[in-house]
Design a protein with these regions (language model features):
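Electropositive phosphate-/nucleotide-binding environments in soluble metabolic enzymes
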Residues: 57, 61, 65, 86-90, ...
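Short, well-ordered amphipathic alpha-helices
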Residues: 68-71, 100, 174-177
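Proline-centered loop/turn at the N-terminus of a beta-strand
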Residues: 47, 108, 142-146
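Glycine-rich phosphate-binding loop
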Residues: 91, 95-133
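Glycine-rich phosphate/diphosphate-binding loop of Rossmann-like nucleotide-binding domains
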Residues: 36-86
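N-terminal glycine-rich FAD/FM-binding segment characteristic of electron-transfer flavoproteins
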Residues: 2-43, 58-62, 85-104, 179, ...
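Short, ordered loop/turn segments at secondary-structure junctions
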Residues: 54-55, 86, 114-115, 149-153
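C-terminal binding/interaction regions
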Residues: 3-7, 11, 15-24, 123-197
Length: 197
């Protein structure tokens, strides 16, 4: 059997006519019958929950600090931020559940942790299971979690990433929290608080 060798010209010829280039669309306004929801990072009316691991605390503290500063820069008030800490990344999914049960008015959550590869399989276990737990929580509860669980090979990689990762997570939480608010208002407009059922 011959080895596969990619042929760019043949590939391009095979695709010719199969795809239509879509012109850029302004995603901030109604375009014909398509309604686009404008992304928003305005945090002035949002309530955000944060779960931060204490293991590798130097990294988690740095991510928390940059997340907090970004939330504040976008208008989130201190009284609208709820924070708890847990021993490590594996405890984050359970804490997300408890935090959301205790504060059902949260608009979005942030999960902060740092998993650094060691010499055993434990790295894969913690990295995979904490991520799976966060994803399971999101799909079960219907609230967004900005996943800021950093998984890296070594401390040097973590040091390079911690500052921006926390700020990125804050922006994700803000945008998704606003989307949740917008969609919640649409549900109320369409069905009202009491639709008679």
């Amino acid at each position: 059997m011959a080895a596969f060798e990619p042929n760019a010209e043949r590939f391009a010829e095979d695709l010719k006519g199969r795809f239509v280039r879509i012109p850029p669309i302004n995603l901030t306004e109604k375009n014909g019958s398509i309604e686009f929801i404008k992304p928003s990072a305005d945090g002035s009316d949002l309530k955000i929950g944060i779960v931060s691991a204490r293991f590798n605390d130097w990294a988690c503290d740095a991510m928390f600090a940059s997340c907090y500063e970004e939330l504040k820069a976008h208008g989130v008030k201190d009284e609208n931020i709820v924070v708890t800490t847990v021993p490590g990344a594996l405890e984050i999914p359970g804490a997300l559940v408890m935090l959301y049960e205790g504060y059902p008015d949260l608009d979005a959550l942030v999960a902060i942790g740092c998993v650094i590869r060691g010499e055993t399989y434990h790295f894969e276990l913690v990295a995979n299971e904490s991520s799976r737990g966060v994803t399971d929580f999101v799909t079960t509860e219907g609230i967004s979690v900005a996943n800021c669980i950093l998984t890296v090979e070594n401390e040097e990689q973590a040091k390079v990433r911690v500052q921006e990762k926390g700020a990125d997570a804050a922006r994700v939480a803000l945008e998704m929290g606003n989307l949740r608010r917008f969609c919640g208002r649409r549900v109320m407009e369409n069905y009202g608080e009491d639709n008679g059922q």
